[in-house]
């Protein structure tokens, strides 16, 4: 008996919509990353992108526990001397609420071309509206 290997052209990808309101950031991000990879499917193959498309709405209402709202820091650097910028979770969720969830999920995906392809299937929106109604996404309870 041979081991089954999924082929990229035969993988069926579904669209799911997730409501992030009141959900904990890390728990939500780990489930989304797992579904983007396709680990919930029987045909999962590590070197093939078998995951589904995930639409996240209400990203501005995601929560963190404890004092992380003030203490959790996000950093970026311009590559120039003295170019380090740091933002707390509170500041970033006010400025760019989608970025918080995107960074959390991106860190949980593989690094390299396959991980970038998986990341492109994630669509995050700050509010309750999204523009993917034509794909008829199913509601996913996490």
UniProtKB/Swiss-Prot annotation:
Pfam families (alphabetical): Ribosomal_L13
Annotated TM spans: none
Keywords: Ribonucleoprotein, Ribosomal protein
UniProt-listed InterPro entries: Ribosomal_uL13 (IPR005822), Ribosomal_uL13_bac-type (IPR005823), Ribosomal_uL13_CS (IPR023563), Ribosomal_uL13_sf (IPR036899)
GO cellular component terms listed in the entry, alphabetical order: cytosolic large ribosomal subunit; ribosome
GO biological process, one term: translation
A GO molecular function held by the record: mRNA binding
Cysteine-cysteine disulfides: none
CDD domains: Ribosomal_L13 (cd00392)
Domain of life: Bacteria
PANTHER family in the cross-refs: LARGE RIBOSOMAL SUBUNIT PROTEIN UL13M, RIBOSOMAL PROTEIN L13
Function: This protein is one of the early assembly proteins of the 50S ribosomal subunit, although it is not seen to bind rRNA by itself. It is important during the early stages of 50S assembly.
Family per record: Belongs to the universal ribosomal protein uL13 family.
Assembly with partners or alone: Part of the 50S ribosomal subunit.
Protein name: Large ribosomal subunit protein uL13
């Amino acid at each position: 008996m041979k081991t089954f290997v999924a082929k990229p052209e035969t993988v069926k990808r579904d669209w799911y919509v997730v409501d992030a309101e009141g959900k904990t950031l890390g728990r939500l991000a780990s489930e989304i990353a797992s579904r983007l990879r396709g680990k919930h499917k029987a045909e999962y193959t590590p070197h093939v992108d078998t995951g589904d498309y995930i639409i996240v709405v209400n990203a501005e209402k995601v929560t963190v526990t404890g004092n992380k709202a003030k203490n959790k820091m996000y950093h970026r650097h311009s590559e120039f001397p003295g170019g380090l910028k740091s933002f707390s979770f509170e500041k970033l969720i006010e400025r760019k609420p989608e970025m918080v969830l995107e960074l959390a999920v991106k860190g949980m995906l593989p690094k390299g071309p396959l991980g970038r392809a998986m990341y492109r299937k994630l669509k995050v929106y700050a509010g309750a509206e999204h523009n993917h109604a034509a794909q008829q996404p199913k509601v996913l309870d996490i």
